[in-house]
């Protein structure tokens, strides 16, 4: 069976922690930030956990499953 290729766009967007959680960046932070509150922008800086509904799909893209 051939080696499974990692989807490179997914590899740049997601990180897997030691505990197996998949972390992602928040959306709505790249532009049009002038109208957003400072607290909202600060909250968008933090990483977020990928939902369990999407976890298997992301793992398949990363070649881990």
From Swiss-Prot:
Checking Gene3D superfamilies in the record gives:
4.10.410.60
PANTHER family named among the record's database cross-references? 54S RIBOSOMAL PROTEIN BL35M, LARGE RIBOSOMAL SUBUNIT PROTEIN BL35M
Q: Which GO terms describe its molecular function?
A: structural constituent of ribosome
Q: What GO CC annotations are associated with the protein?
A: cytosolic large ribosomal subunit
Family from the record: Belongs to the bacterial ribosomal protein bL35 family.
Q: Which domain of life is it from?
A: Bacteria
Pfam families assigned to the protein according to its UniProt record, in alphabetical order: Ribosomal_L35p
The answer, when asked if Transmembrane is one of the entry's keywords, is no
Protein's recorded name: Large ribosomal subunit protein bL35
Q: Which UniProt keywords apply?
A: Ribonucleoprotein, Ribosomal protein
What does the entry give for GO biological process?
translation
